[in-house]
């Protein structure tokens, strides 16, 4: 299935990207991947609250083929496999190594030996801090859906849509 998705990137000047940049942070939910939002509103919100170093962010539009993705949002079987895999690995770490599984260890294991080895990416629901997702206090009624893309060949196009201001400052001025 082809999905229209949005990639948020910190704006570092007038030159726009020709392809997305992979996130390589150890605390990224699915480790090293190209992260996309399913909603342009979520992409803009992420830019405003997290892309603060330059005071601006760019939003790019892409078509992503998600046929071989693990869909933890809309596919119940995929969700149950994902949930069970996490719980088994966390328990194994606790019982055999006597420690809690870190996010980095989970992602490294799944990419090298487990669940993510045979998929092109993951569709997942993020927890939102955007007040527009909470019309009723305490109830997130809108899903904030992201894609973590492992196989960049599934990204069919990459087009700059707009630049906007974040809630930050420009440290390069």
PLM region spans:
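ADP-ribose/NAD+-binding catalytic cleft of ART/PARP-like enzymes
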Residues: 1-31, 48
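Active-site and NAD+-binding cores of ADP-ribose-processing enzymes
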Residues: 3-8, 15-18, 58-173
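Residues that flank catalytic or metal-binding motifs in active/ligand-binding sites
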Residues: 30-33, 58
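Short active-site loop/helix that positions an aromatic residue
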Residues: 41-54
